[in-house]
């Protein structure tokens, strides 16, 4: 792994996603805690009619908030254009950013009425670094 802690980094792992860490699997919590104490920072609701300028502005505001905390690592996942805008800003400032990688396991049940019911389960496997 090419991530290295330096003297500027704090000791926190910021979870900037729609998935509160309280609901994570033990494997995901353990993996995050290798980088620092987990701090949840709620992912914003991005309106579908938001303009590119509005999304960029929101990314800038949250980049400033994140950078001020001097995180060791940031998990950033959610609406694509906002995620891209934020990740780009964080990497430009030397902040390491990751996405969670999960295996999707699907159970399919065929019901007596002919319908099909699918249950999806996501099993955390690792964090993958963004390299923009």
Please report, for each region that a protein language model flagged, where it lies by residue:
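Long, low-complexity, Lys/Arg-enriched
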Residues: 1-71, 88, 92-132
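Gly/Ser/Thr-rich loops at beta-strand to alpha-helix junctions
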Residues: 19-21, 75-84
